[in-house]
């Protein structure tokens, strides 16, 4: 799988980073170019720095994306060093913006996943969910809103790979307690 990151908040400049994800024409252009160069499945990673994620998501699918991934980090200024009056982290004075991730972004991620899953033009398009997943319950919520897979990065960086085993164990217990035999039985259950 190739995941096209149309949402990196660390790249600043017109037509770069998360700006790509806000422009359906650029999303379509880069998705089509990627599809032309590979036979691997292509996911378009959407930016949360937008009001209606469905618009660029639809452009990605029309251009050939095999699925969507959401969400990336939220563009932010983490803090200001009150001694130097520069942003932190400061990379040669050129990095005032960064990406905010972790548990706090989960409700935002779920909202965007919900919107895309309900969009008529995106019906049947696989979604890989991410954003604030720390526990099996978090992962299950993304699945319940229609995600076929989930991705976990910040939590692994914070707590180590052990959390993956805990997620698997928790999900197995949940399935058994609820008479289910496959995680696929939870996908989309929270959708109308």
Model-derived features with residue positions:
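Short beta-strand/loop segments at the ligand-binding rim of alpha/beta enzyme cores
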Residues: 36-47, 118-130
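Generic structural signal for well-ordered alpha-helices
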Residues: 24-32, 54-58, 110-114, 139, ...
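Extended, intrinsically disordered, low-complexity segments
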Residues: 106, 169-192
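Glycine/Thr-rich beta-alpha phosphate-binding loop at enzyme active sites
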Residues: 9-25, 56, 63-125
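Glycine-rich phosphate-binding active-site loops on the catalytic face of alpha/beta enzymes
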Residues: 6-10, 63, 67-78, 132-133, ...
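C-terminal helical cap(s) of enzyme catalytic domains, especially alpha/beta-barrels
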Residues: 79-98, 143, 156-180
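Conserved, mostly hydrophobic/aromatic
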Residues: 4, 45, 68, 116, ...
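Active-site glycine- and acidic-residue-rich loops that bind
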Residues: 41-67
């Amino acid at each position: 799988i190739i995941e096209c990151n149309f949402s990196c908040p660390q790249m600043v400049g017109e037509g770069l980073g998360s700006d790509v994800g806000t422009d359906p024409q650029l999303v379509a252009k880069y998705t089509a170019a990627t599809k032309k160069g590979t036979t691997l499945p292509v996911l378009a990673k959407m930016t949360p720095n937008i009001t209606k994620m469905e618009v660029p998501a639809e452009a990605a699918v029309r251009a050939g994306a095999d699925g969507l991934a959401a969400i990336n980090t939220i563009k932010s200024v983490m803090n200001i060093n009150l001694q130097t009056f520069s942003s932190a982290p400061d990379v040669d004075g050129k990095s005032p913006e960064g990406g905010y991730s972790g548990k706090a972004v989960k409700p935002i991620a779920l909202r965007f996943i919900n919107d895309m899953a309900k969009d008529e033009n995106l019906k049947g398009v696989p979604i890989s969910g991410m954003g604030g997943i720390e526990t099996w319950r978090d992962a299950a919520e993304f699945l319940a809103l229609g995600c076929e897979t989930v991705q976990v990065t910040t939590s692994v960086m914070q707590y180590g790979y052990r959390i993956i085993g805990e997620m698997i164990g928790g999900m197995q217990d949940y399935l058994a307690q609820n008479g289910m035999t496959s995680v696929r039985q939870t996908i989309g259950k929270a959708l109308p």
